[in-house]
């Protein structure tokens, strides 16, 4: 079994896991392993380098347009990128508001 990288530690019971931003996937699963710079990818996708940089650093969301471009460039599907973003957004919202919403909103059965 491969050992964790120097940046990653084994997951232990009780650990709180942060949501994974699509930019982290882009950097760690695509750019890094393929030896691609953010600038090179941006040029090939015909987007500003700043867009790729902000996505990689979790400061920008993957839009439908960017998902189409990432999919074309890396040979994936746009749904892959959009689903990563949607999952991230839901996890962030759940962490921020999930408990409050659960206490405020009645279920259909409770409201009847």
Question: How would you describe each model-predicted region?
Answer:
Residues 1-28, 33-34, 101-105, 110-112:
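N-terminal flexible/basic segments that precede or flank functional cores
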Residues 32, 43, 72:
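Alpha-helical residues within the helix-turn-helix
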Residues 35-36, 65:
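Residue-level signal for the short linker/turn that defines the boundary of a DNA-recognition helix
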Residues 48, 59, 74, 85-88:
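The DNA-recognition helices of helix-turn-helix-type DNA-binding domains
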Residues 82-112:
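Short, charged recognition helix plus adjacent turn
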